[in-house]
Amino acid sequence: MLSSTKTQGKNLMRLPVAAALVLAGVALFAGTATAQTGYVGILGGGPVYKNDDKTNIKELKTAGFTELLVWSVEVNASGDLNLNGEFPLTSGGKYIGDQTWPKFAKALKNIKTGKVTRITLSIGSSNVGDFQNIKALVDSQGTGKKSILYKDFAAIAKALPIDAIDFDDENSYDEESTVQFALMLGGLGYHVTMNPYTNNTYWTSTVSAINTQMPGLVDGIHLQTFAGGQGNSPCSSEWDFGDVPVFPGLSDQPGAPPFKTPTAAEAQLKTWHSQCGITGAWLWIFDQIAGTDQVKEYAKDMTKGVNGE
């Protein structure tokens, strides 16, 4: 995906941890992939948390979108999490987001009292480093309860109403560490989604490996069909993830072509629904249309499109 506003375990010693997470998570996630009915989502950055007047929160709560993707979480070399390089979320495995934006947790909870039923935290972007750091941390510490990644996401789970973690890896593509990281998240109660734009063989293999060990953990694919993903189709065989539904992402931003108006988005989604029965989609990016009537227009028209109306 476009850059943010600031522009495999390696040995057998990890197997007991992975196995424990699988045993803990299978009952939780079994069958959820086929039960997935789809979401119409919107991805947003700074405007989701920089909101003293509550206008953006009200828009997101009432517009009609059913999923909010909060983007982009950066993972530094020590394992600390930060939104867009300007909003520290964790330090040393403890949640510190309330020090910068104390109303963030309350705002997300408020959003979920409206139309939004799922909040997803998206990691990565076109920036190099996030998933390389995750790989290094998994290699050095594993994913057990004493690891920094486990502590980070346990702290996030306690502080914020996050349902899923989205993997927007655009340059690391290490299957082994990604699988271990995903299984850890599943053990903590999260679902996992993927956010690809290229390298389909990596993504299909990784999703298969994850869901083989913890069925239903990966329950959606946020496929980019704009910018670097221009030309991608959720109906293409190269993006076939079996029982895991593919939700195409459309762009409201002229700088991330092809730009789609609400009406054009509806038409495109209706075509894909007719071709392969898509049940969901998502919009890049809330930041472009925050404070305008287009938020509701996109939600309404995209919902009609994925329903084939």
What are the language-model segments listed below?
Residues 19-28:
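Bacterial N-terminal signal peptides
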